Design a protein with these regions (language model features):
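Single conserved hydrophobic/aromatic residue that forms the stacking wall/gate
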Residues: 2-14
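Helicase-associated low-complexity/disordered flanking segments
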Residues: 63, 81, 85-98, 102-213
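Conserved helix/coil segment N-terminal to the catalytic DExD/H
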Residues: 295-336
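SF2 helicase catalytic motif II
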Residues: 317-320, 328-367
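Post-DEXD/H (motif II) to motif III coupling segment of the RecA-like Helicase ATP-binding lobe
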Residues: 347-407
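Extended, highly charged accessory segments
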Residues: 375-379, 385, 564, 606, ...
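Conserved interdomain linker/interface between the two RecA-like ATPase lobes of SF2 helicase motors
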Residues: 388-393, 400-460
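Conserved segment of the helicase C-terminal RecA-like domain
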Residues: 546-587
Length: 1023
């Protein structure tokens, strides 16, 4: 080995010397053609981990392109021999197929091989070549290409050019290419024309001379006094639907005000500047104060804003916790309130949507108490099902809502491509697919080099940073540094100043491409974009269409590419691309009758304005009188007051999006420069990112963590140029620790339990991983655990059932995990929730499939467990507990009715799975549910063990199929507390509205997992 390294260094030194001589000769203009013998051609053979190959061969996908294996990914000698033999056989088979084909066609096989190899033969450095362009010339040419939108080729030409790339292997799946034709603009006139000066201001600031049909219809409806919801495509000019009515209302009444609510601060800032520009160009309103009022507003500025502001930009959280509780300070504003804007309506669903719906009812109630019945609500949304119905549920009104869904805005033709990374070896699919990071980099570079301004959406922050670094490195390697300088990342976590700078650079065309998370999914205007690449199937179909709408914002042709990950849900869509274009998410749901949510908001409302049940029942429903009697104090006039404690602030104790998290500050402590803050990161992320030795990426720059001060919530990083990233070695245990309630299910000895649940996350080390996902080193670290408390429901799976499943060659953990997914996906049938409102314990592939070669001492109880998102105050799991019998029955019906073989998003797989559905068995899930419902677990016609339906049968001995499980033991009750078994009632077994069930698309996806909290006490039981 030492001799090899010595010779290699000599070769490199000789090569560099020849390069220097050649450069000097070229500079003098007398460069002779050097002899070929003056060069040494170096080869490097980089093989994949054999254990990774074996994992893929067994039907499971390695998690997030990780290589499994020991220190460095080595494999036993026997595995290496088998791999070599298999590859020899593949090569021999390919040669024989070539010879047979040539014999039939009359071609010369040797000539074909030589011709095909020509493109792969390294070129001698001394071969004649064109003079290279200077870096300055390259920058100037590329800048000119970006500055002229018409200079780039058409999207059809760009796609055609893919076929000339050496890495092209027909990655667009069969049936995955679609063309959505261009749409011409449709205009309409307002029933009452705009004032001439306002029309001129609109032309000057927005370059709008005529209104589209949907804009005119919405403005006319608002002028008639109706509430309006506009559900049209991205970049269809929806903001004018509320900007113009606000201007008209402010001019009409000197005391009129408007309230604009946005789910994110970035979106609020974007629309704030747009409205300010319009009003500033309209002389009658040029002095109107338009401002934000949120958590960043300085305390000393708030009094003046409340007194003088006429248009307030805020968010639902600020309205709930700061504005409504100070009703007396906002009376001027509420009396004059004429327009309320609720942008991005599709965001408000599940528990968060239920909270916001009650906040809006409280707002309507305060305005009515002040004699203001002239408030009109206008909402904009991406395309959703039943927009009028959903807005009515949010506002608590049954009539007077106009829904506008016909889009009159123009758009260019849009090309869609469903793209699957190619197999590493077409003759040996067991080796898996090419890295999607590398595939995304190739596609992204192909686009931006041609002046196609591109945004690549990654599902998580870390992926965005890794892909950005790979794209930049690949561009520099191609000698295209001028392009690499114009590719940036955008995600939450960056400072406000950095994000505003990136937005402005993108808007003004100074950036060629951007790698982003869903932080750019909502409608912040970043200018013209030509292409969208989605790396991995988004968490919801609505998100997919929202991201796709980012392309083609300036009426030119555009491209959308859905690049599938190797995980089961993504591969389901790769194999069924028609579902990408035809499926839709289920209707959005809110539940203002949720006991805990309603109780909390009734307390808030009583503190704002005393409650008169006979009047306020229209806002809070028929349960209001009983709630007032139980929670509030009645005065002599029949009004109810909140008097729990002097100075109490119930709104402060009720976070709409879950409990506030502790944040860690990441500090750049690189020697030789002043310390600066990189990011502020929630604790549930920081525990997996910030430990000594961890590699952290920020804007594509690599940092290494040198110290973590948990008492100060601070982590220190220094810049380092390393060629690897780190992956934590961790585990998370979800344990039921205290039983509060027990219910019998109508099946003898099967029970459902409800109580306190603890979630403990531990990081005990990390892997150093190179860009090919090979493990370079294994390091141990000590970090404190992250412990969170919540409440949940669980059903124990008897050990006899576990043994029965293993006897049929199915991994028992895979069966239980798949059954949990099947039940979890159905919870919206009984309670208004999105999938992350209720969660489950997901199984890790390496641990579960390690078998006897990776024994574990950390046994997990054999049970189905579901729990509320930590920090949530709605107790969704309490309703899951109530309807557990129906959920088990419907889940079994869905699995048995699904036509897939190994599981799909329609039955046992979900995008919300934190382990990418690596541990899953459809047949096992069916057996678990049948057993809990006291039905025969297996049929005689079940497929034999070697068929595809038994994807986990390869594991061999029965112990290997249960080695991570133990018999679930009873969970104790609270000290000195006796819990009686509740009998199930007829209402609890009633099936939900099956029309809603029928509308649930087969591949039901779920939203991006939100952050957890550090420690949260269990929510109280309903009164």
């Amino acid at each position: 080995h030492k001799e090899y390294r010595r010779q290699r260094q000599m070769c490199i030194r000789d090569r560099d010397k020849v390069y220097e001589q050649l450069a000097a000769a070229e500079a003098s203009g007398s460069a002779p053609r050097p002899a070929r013998t003056g060069y040494v051609l170096l080869f490097e053979f980089a093989d994949r981990s054999v254990e990774t190959v074996k994992a893929t061969a067994s039907g499971r996908i390695p998690k997030r392109r990780k290589a499994s294996g020991g220190n460095g990914g080595s494999a036993p000698d026997l595995d290496i021999v088998q791999t070599i033999q298999r590859r020899n056989a593949s090569f021999e088979r390919a040669v024989n197929e070539l010879l047979a084909a040539c014999a039939a066609s009359g071609d010369d096989p040797v000539k074909l091989v030589y011709d095909a190899a020509a493109a792969h033969v390294p070129i001698c450095p001394g071969a004649p070549r064109d003079a290279p362009l200077s870096p300055r010339t390259k920058r100037e040419r590329f800048g000119a290409l970006l500055s002229d939108p018409n200079a780039r080729p058409s999207i059809v030409e760009v796609l055609q050019g893919l076929k000339e790339e050496p890495w092209w292997q027909d990655q667009i799946v069969p049936g995955g290419r679609r063309t959505f034709p261009a749409h011409e603009a449709e205009y309409a006139e307002l029933a009452t024309p705009l004032p001439e000066a306002l029309a001129r201001a609109l032309q000057a600031t927005h370059n709008v001379h005529r209104l589209y049909t949907h804009q005119a219809a919405a403005i006319d409806a608002l002028e008639r006094g109706e509430h309006v919801v506009v559900s049209t495509g991205t970049s269809s000019g929806k903001s004018l639907v509320y900007q113009l009515p606000i201007a008209l209302a402010l001019e009409r009444e000197a005391s009129a005000t408007a309230l604009c609510m946005f789910p994110t601060k970035a979106l609020a800032q974007d629309q704030l500047q747009s409205l300010r520009a319009l009003l500033g160009a309209y002389e009658p309103l040029e002095d109107v104060l338009v401002s934000t009022y949120d958590g960043d507003t300085a305390t000393e500025d708030r009094f003046e804003l409340r007194s003088t502001m006429r248009v307030c930009f805020t968010n639902p959280d600020m309205l709930h916790q700061s504005i409504l509780p100070q009703e007396e300070r906002w009376r001027r504003f509420f009396r004059g309130l004429r327009i309320v804007v609720l942008d991005e309506l599709h965001v408000y669903s599940g528990v968060f949507g239920s909270h916001v719906a009650l906040v809006l009812r409280r707002l309507r109630r305060i305005c009515a108490a002040l004699g203001n019945d002239s408030v009109r609500f206008v909402s904009c949304s991406a395309t959703i099902a039943r927009p009028a119905e959903h807005m009515g549920a949010m506002l608590g009104v049954d009539a007077g809502i106009t829904a506008i869904e016909q889009d009159g805005a123009p758009h260019g033709a849009k090309e869609w491509a469903v793209w699957n990374a190619p197999l590493i070896d077409a003759h040996d699919p067991s080796q898996g697919r090419v890295s999607t990071y590398a595939e995304a980099s190739r596609l992204f570079r192909h686009l931006v080099r041609r002046g196609v301004r591109t945004i690549l959406f990654a599902k998580v922050r870390r992926t965005a940073e890794i892909v950005l670094r790979q794209i930049r490195e690949d561009l520099v390697r191609e000698d295209r540094a001028e392009v690499a300088d114009r590719v940036v990342a955008y995600r939450s976590g960056y400072s406000v100043a950095d994000r505003r700078r990136i937005e402005q650079d993108m808007f003004h065309g100074r950036i060629a491409g951007i790698v982003a998370t869903s932080a750019l999914e909502l409608g912040v205007d970043i200018g013209r974009l030509d292409a969208v690449v989605m790396l991995g199937m988004p968490y919801t179909l609505a998100s997919m269409w929202q991201q796709a709408g980012r392309a083609g914002r300036r009426n030119r042709d555009a491209l959308v590419v859905l690049l599938g990950d190797p995980f089961p849900v993504d591969q389901f869509y790769m194999n069924n691309p028609e579902l990408v274009f035809t499926q839709r998410d289920p209707p959005l749901v809110v539940d203002v009758n949720n006991e805990l949510v309603l109780e909390a908001h009734v307390k808030c409302a009583a503190l704002e304005v005393p409650i008169a049940p006979s009047e306020d029942v229209r806002y809070f429903g028929p349960r209001l009188p009983a709630l007032c009697a139980a929670l509030l104090e009645r005065d002599g006039h029949g009004f109810y007051h909140y008097t729990d404690a002097p100075g109490a602030q119930p709104a402060r104790e009720l976070p709409l999006r879950g409990a506030r998290q502790t944040s860690y500050t990441y500090v750049d402590a690189t020697p030789g420069q002043p310390p600066r803050t990189l990011e502020e990161v929630e604790v549930e992320r920081a525990i997996f990112e910030a430990f000594e030795g961890a590699v952290f990426l920020h804007q594509g720059v690599t940092y290494i963590c040198t110290a973590v001060q948990h008492e100060l919530c601070m982590a220190r990083f220094v810049r380092a140029n390393v060629r690897y990233h780190t992956r934590p070695r961790d585990h998370t245990d979800t344990d039921a620790v205290e039983t509060w309630r027990i219910r019998t299910l109508p099946h003898a000895d099967v029970y459902a339990y409800f109580g306190r649940v603890t979630i403990s996350s531990h990081v005990w080390g990390y892997y150093k991983v190179d860009r090919r996902a090979q493990i370079l080193d294994t390091v141990d670290v000590e970090t404190p655990p992250l412990i969170r408390h919540t409440q949940g429901v669980w059903v124990d799976v008897p050990w006899a059932m576990v043994n029965e499943i293993a006897a049929h060659g199915i991994n028992a953990s895979a069966a239980i995990h798949a059954a949990e997914h099947a039940v979890l996906s159905l919870t919206p049938l009984f309670v208004a929730s999105v999938s992350q409102d209720v969660q489950t314990e997901c199984k890790v592939g390496k641990r579960e499939y390690g078998g006897q070669s990776h024994p574990t001492r950390r046994k997990r109880p054999s049970r189905l467990i579901f729990f509320d998102k930590p920090g949530q105050t709605a107790s969704v799991s309490a309703r899951v507990f109530r309807h557990m019998d129906s959920l088990l029955r419907i889940a079994l019906e869905v699995i048995e009715a699904c036509g897939c073989v190994d599981g799909c998003p329609g039955c046992v797989e979900t995008q919300a799975c934190t382990e990418d559905n690596a541990v899953s068995s459809k047949h096992g899930a069916r057996a678990v549910l049948r057993g809990l419902l006291r039905q025969p677990m297996f049929d005689e016609h079940d497929p034999p063990l070697d068929e595809q339906g038994h994807a986990t049968s390869y594991l061999g001995p029965r112990d290997a199929l249960t080695h991570t499980l133990c018999d679930a033991q009873p969970v104790p009750t609270a000290p000195d507390t006796e819990v009686h078994v509740e009998e199930i009632t007829e209402d609890d077994t009633a099936l939900p509205d099956m029309q809603q069930h029928a509308e649930r698309p087969a591949p039901r996806l779920s939203p991006e997992p939100p952050a957890y909290v550090e420690t949260v006490s269990p929510a109280p039981q309903p009164s």
